[in-house]
């Protein structure tokens, strides 16, 4: 019996060492098949969401599980019924993680522990024990406690020598809305004391609230693509589901995706979207023209703009008509009047910017672009107008206008990609100024901080990418200003965080920006709401001998490989009233240690 256990331990150690080396060399990412129907993943910290609340934050870890069902493993009868067809279709989709029987999982952890015990000379042949990453095993909750995860992690000394093993057991039940079934904090403390013989204990609380799920912003413009949650951490927990005290450390987690139809900056997004269409057309040679929002043709609108400027030269008009000017302003920043606008309208649009505003909503073909620029160039050549442009503008059209001041315009052929490039250039110039006006106008950034994003020394495609970054930053800041009513003291550090991230990273709307904040600033958003996650940690011991018992409630299923009995109430309740209760999954993480010497 012992010989068999030793052999199993050596085989596991050799397998885990081998796949770890493969991953380090970049040869494979797995999963790696072990015996029979068991497979192992090697994952990096932060890449295993199911374990984010349970593991201790190791850089690399193993996850062992049962190999998922596949079409190859499950040939179906030709005479399958509807249920069989449904099963067949489910196999074609991404396979769900499968759990290992809890008893088998314990045996794997036993083998893992044996290989790390320096006293087991017969296993390591006198060679120093090689420390492997932590091992976590998905369990099927087949035991009485409902164990869904088992984990083991070597305890190392300051000299990187193995002195013991730390074990974690994760049990889960639920879902339930019956709070009377939750243990009291005193009973959890007592259980921890009896398990670890601890006299000195401390408690630490954690709670996460979904601010867009609260009554304050119900029916707001933010949909599921965007989320703002707040994490609270505090010491000295008083009771289960305690409201985070105002002395808690609070952090906002902000993820915003552009394109919400009712966003305060949706009109700016649409303008950017057209810019992206042009950039893609320049890159591929094929342009997917969006539907126009103007009833008049692009040529008519541009001709009307030129006529106004001609009349100004002839002294018949002192400015572009008031009606058109107001329309251009509204194009720049159309904001829901029910929400105080964060965007300030620009009143200093030059000719190129006004031309962009006309063309972006009316051109529907390459020929439209050519015809519009032909009208402009002819008017400039004949001296019919002398439009003003912003100093420093580097677009092709701006250079032509500057040359027209001296009656010495260079010849320009509107063929090939030139017209598309000219339109993209004036759009980039205009939008850069819009974003500068916003961030500098709100004292959120200086010109020097924004210089990277508006630089013209890089190619057009890179300029477009940087403008996309500016827009995402704007969306993030606007959400916090419009819906959380955050003031300058919070928006300024948030903007600086966004600027720093986007100077070093590519555009990524899935990135979660974090902002430390005083709980009192956002108290109205969470004090009458239910937490999405609530957790208490009971801690005793110090350093390597620290042990912890964690008990938590989550509104979402905490593990993806175990099925739970569903109660009569909906699992994903929407909190829209004070009398509604949230359904929770109770989870407990227990810790134990074994010391080898």
Swiss-Prot record:
InterPro entries: Zwilch (IPR018630). It comes from the Eukaryota. Essential component of the mitotic checkpoint, which prevents cells from prematurely exiting mitosis. Required for the assembly of the dynein-dynactin and mad1-mad2 complexes onto kinetochores. Belongs to the ZWILCH family. This is Protein zwilch homolog. Pfam families: Zwilch. It is found in: Chromosome, Centromere, Kinetochore. It comes from Xenopus tropicalis (Western clawed frog). GO terms for biological process: cell division; mitotic spindle assembly checkpoint signaling. Transmembrane segments: none annotated. The gene is zwilch. GO terms for cellular component: RZZ complex. Keywords: Cell cycle, Cell division, Centromere, Chromosome, Kinetochore, Mitosis. Component of the RZZ complex composed of kntc1/rod, zw10 and zwilch.
